[in-house]
A protein has these predicted regions:
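Beta-rich nucleic-acid/ligand-interaction surfaces
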Residues: 165-171
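Low-complexity, Ser/Thr/Pro/Gly-rich disordered linker/stalk regions
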Residues: 1-129, 135-137, 155, 171-224
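Localized edge beta-strand/strand-to-loop motifs within extracellular or lumenal beta-rich domains
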Residues: 140-164
């Protein structure tokens, strides 16, 4: 059984107390690098797994778009824009780039469309090599799901998901990508997104997360 599940929902996902009427997200960050006092090299083959409870569809926010996200914060060396000198002139040079691949629970609400007769949900993957999100598996059941993301020494990101709370296997594999064309070098942390319409009246969909774990195949130094 659970020893510390966390229910997450939000109403003002932009500026607290100031509704914008535009979809925003709140982030719940695990801050793995602060607990370990270091970042995780991809040679250690990190992976993160979490359980997430999806409520009955009738309890979801009546809004099409992303409702929940499970993502990593990764680092690579890439061409980035920097401000140089007193005049803060901008130029591009090689530097440390942080990016955030992951999976979103996407909802297509029949309340938003006259032609849509049913609600529909699926996983949206971030991202392909060009930086574009793409559609993953359809979500055909609510309740508990298990989601996982791993990074291999070649810098590739691998995505897994399955209904239920069983450990993930090869059968739960979705895709492998170099998001944005980047080859990951280090992992900083993982985090969750809670999204809402940010209109100050409706709460976001309530999701429960439980049992998040970070695994290293070849850990360096001190054991986790």
């Amino acid at each position: 059984g659970s020893k510390g599940a966390l229910l997450m929902r939000s109403k003002f996902t932009g500026i607290p107390g100031n509704a914008s009427g535009t979809m925003h997200q709140d982030d719940f960050i695990a801050n793995v690098q602060y607990r370990l006092k270091r970042r995780i090299d991809v040679s250690e083959v990190p992976s993160v797994r979490t359980r997430v409870f999806l409520p009955p569809v009738a309890e979801w926010e009546k809004r099409s778009g992303p409702h929940f996200g499970f993502r990593l914060a990764l680092e690579t060396t890439a061409l980035i824009e920097k401000e140089i000198g007193f005049l803060k002139l901008k130029r591009k040079e090689m530097g440390n780039e942080i990016y955030w691949p992951g999976m979103f629970i996407e909802f297509e609400s029949k309340a938003d469309s006259r032609s849509r007769t049913d609600d529909y949900a699926y996983l949206r993957v971030r991202s392909n090599q060009r930086g574009a999100d793409f559609r993953g598996p359809q979500i055909t059941t609510t309740g508990w799901w298990t989601m996982g993301i791993s990074v291999t020494p070649d810098g590739m990101v691998h995505y897994y998901a399955s209904p239920g709370v069983e450990d993930l296997t090869e059968e739960d594999y979705i895709t492998s990508q170099f998001p944005y064309g980047y080859e990951a070098e280090r992992m900083r942390t993982f985090f969750y997104n809670i999204c809402s319409a940010d209109e100050g009246r409706r709460w976001s969909t309530s999701f429960i997360v439980d049992d998040p774990k970070v695994f290293l195949v070849r850990p360096k130094g001190k054991q986790m």
